[in-house]
Amino acid sequence: MAQLFLPLLAALVLAQAPAALADVLEGDSSEDRAFRVRIAGDAPLQGVLGGALTIPCHVHYLRPPPSRRAVLGSPRVKWTFLSRGREAEVLVARGVRVKVNEAYRFRVALPAYPASLTDVSLALSELRPNDSGIYRCEVQHGIDDSSDAVEVKVKGVVFLYREGSARYAFSFSGAQEACARIGAHIATPEQLYAAYLGGYEQCDAGWLSDQTVRYPIQTPREACYGDMDGFPGVRNYGVVDPDDLYDVYCYAEDLNGELFLGDPPEKLTLEEARAYCQERGAEIATTGQLYAAWDGGLDHCSPGWLADGSVRYPIVTPSQRCGGGLPGVKTLFLFPNQTGFPNKHSRFNVYCFRDSAQPSAIPEASNPASNPASDGLEAIVTVTETLEELQLPQEATESESRGAIYSIPIMEDGGGGSSTPEDPAEAPRTLLEFETQSMVPPTGFSEEEGKALEEEEKYEDEEEKEEEEEEEEVEDEALWAWPSELSSPGPEASLPTEPAAQEESLSQAPARAVLQPGASPLPDGESEASRPPRVHGPPTETLPTPRERNLASPSPSTLVEAREVGEATGGPELSGVPRGESEETGSSEGAPSLLPATRAPEGTRELEAPSEDNSGRTAPAGTSVQAQPVLPTDSASRGGVAVVPASGDCVPSPCHNGGTCLEEEEGVRCLCLPGYGGDLCDVGLRFCNPGWDAFQGACYKHFSTRRSWEEAETQCRMYGAHLASISTPEEQDFINNRYREYQWIGLNDRTIEGDFLWSDGVPLLYENWNPGQPDSYFLSGENCVVMVWHDQGQWSDVPCNYHLSYTCKMGLVSCGPPPELPLAQVFGRPRLRYEVDTVLRYRCREGLAQRNLPLIRCQENGRWEAPQISCVPRRPARALHPEEDPEGRQGRLLGRWKALLIPPSSPMPGP
């Protein structure tokens, strides 16, 4: 028994020996230590932006303190600042000698030292956002030393605010009311200056509390010189007439409650969002509350409604798919001039706010790499992580290369351009850098460029679900995603929104059509490889009977058929032409392969070239040649398929003006672009305006006047055009050989760094980069593309503020305003002209129910499809129970409405 007990006792003694030894050592250490340093107060210590804060640090001597003799006998005091794993000295003092870091000059002091050797508290004034971090107080006296540390959090955020309707819309009194309405206060000059010192930059003039108008600029440039020319600083217009109109700088600080993201399975309209929050004992959050929550650590990669009708989302930990390179509150604007909030019927998540007696904790920053859907959790937790300002390299001069960028008036959207702050005006922020205004990203806070989003307003008739086959919603609402005033450049393409392309099954009325090559756009998230090519049988023509077709809603601002240049092995190439642009046969080295064929609309002739022709070449197989429905009497004006004598193959192509050669048993067919006709597509049916050059279904006009990229795009849009987009090698050669100059083209990556898009929304189907291009690295400012004519027209990315010549391009065929209906209206803002294949959607007026297809398409003949929509009164619920309506008044009333409202050509809806 003793043999078992002794080992157990020894084990217990050994187990407790380390703890006892530690107590002894600690006691010895405490006895040997001459003093101890302690920072009083609960962590984190909180200060306010632009204010002052004293960090209390005291020395507690465990032995009698030394007598005050000479300076050499004084303790050495050192304050350091730790942030992001880096440590920087704030000041070092010994007696009356004090050394202060240049970054803290005139802002820090030891108010009690050396008069008191036990009080080494640090006074910090003019607090900035990047003053948040860990401060360590270290005291050394002789061979003894001790230290303590505390976290400091600077509260408060300054942000620019504007109404969604217009830019520069506030008088001084209106500016004060606007900030109060969104749960904030109008900022003071001291707060704006502190934000500027923290890296904030905004090239927009805004009201401050002292009735002055100012704006902060880190990197001076032409559009943002103000009263300081080429020097950085806060531009000041001085005291301004209170009736003048500007934006306003607001300040948000405390969040006295819980702010959480509402993420229901079904996205919400604005009214539904308000009801959603009320059902949970909360109210829809204000813009100021969201900024305060973001400043406290709220991070959600999901746009949500706010009380003022804006849609925003906060990013603390940015990533390439959520917020780009810098943190901030991102905002979705409707127009590229940063105005217009999303339509109230659009569907998003919602940010709710639940009031409480004490300031609430902020939801823990979510991981942006996670699924945004997981952000719907309403758990509120305390964030212990400190929000730090992102510092950019001071020596970086690429920021200046962004230069002055002016607002682009979007004539078709009714949006007007804006002038520079001196007028006053604005320069774009970074992306998301503002597409119409260039803004150099400041160290920490910067505006991101606008990113174009395509989203259709989704409307669904509840009664229609019960009585008719349910129609899926088509997304067709053009939203420009522009970040908010504190956003940062460079978000990834996958901005957190609903997929921009969703398939919808739509009924199509019979119509004659002429064949067009192409492939329908793929839904978002589906790769080409996942859809094998379809091989069609012998040439057949679809009978003109009603049938269902699949219509996808792609992300460009207008619905266009996505087509790509393809090359068959050893055979001819089919070159698709988006929006009526050029196409021509021939091979293109390195061009993408033809998209797999998809189901064609009614009126489509499905053709397949023979697998081998007489010359042994293999023709493309499984090519779906899609026809677009038109009125029978208009088929000639939109081009067509003509049969010419068989020549063995289509090389060289006998077709002119970009016509596509198709081989059939009965001969060779020429598929003509819109605006051309004849057997060989050699007859012009439409012509460009005087001064414009026609080429393969498009019109071009070159301007030798040198402008920045934004100014050039603005000028093109004034003509209803865009900077030239290039879809084929033939179009590249035409532009480069005809207009032999360095010139802008419409390609740019200002929306998302590295994701190049055409300004007219045409898919990027062809590239002609110079070797080593594009070479723009993050935040370098090389976001626009130039064609170098003497180098075979190869492309290079350069800063957008270069002044170069440019070429504008518009479709040869376009549609005017859509037909007006007495009981329905079109979604979106009207435009001067609509490209071919643009799809618009009608909606019935309030109180009426929709019947039949609500979509119309701009046809290749420049005419809109005849509207099929019918609007009828909603059926009262009790009409379903005849016994409750013995006199049949509901039925008679419904019959009179039908007779009055339904067009004679429209089919009568079933009961």
Curated annotation (Swiss-Prot):
Signal peptide feature range: 1-22
Annotated region described as O-glycosylated at two sites, given as residue ranges: 520-530, 540-545
Keyword presence, Glycoprotein: yes
Subcellular location: Secreted
Tissue-specificity statement: Expressed in the retina, specifically in the inner nuclear layer, inner plexiform layer and ganglion cell layer (at protein level). Detected in cerebrospinal fluid (at protein level). Detected in urine (at protein level).
Region of interest (Disordered), residue spans: 391-641
CC terms in the record's Gene Ontology section: extracellular region; extracellular space; glutamatergic synapse; Golgi lumen; lysosomal lumen; perineuronal net; side of membrane; synapse
PANTHER family per UniProt: AGGRECAN/VERSICAN PROTEOGLYCAN, BREVICAN CORE PROTEIN
Record-given protein name: Brevican core protein
Protein source organism: Homo sapiens
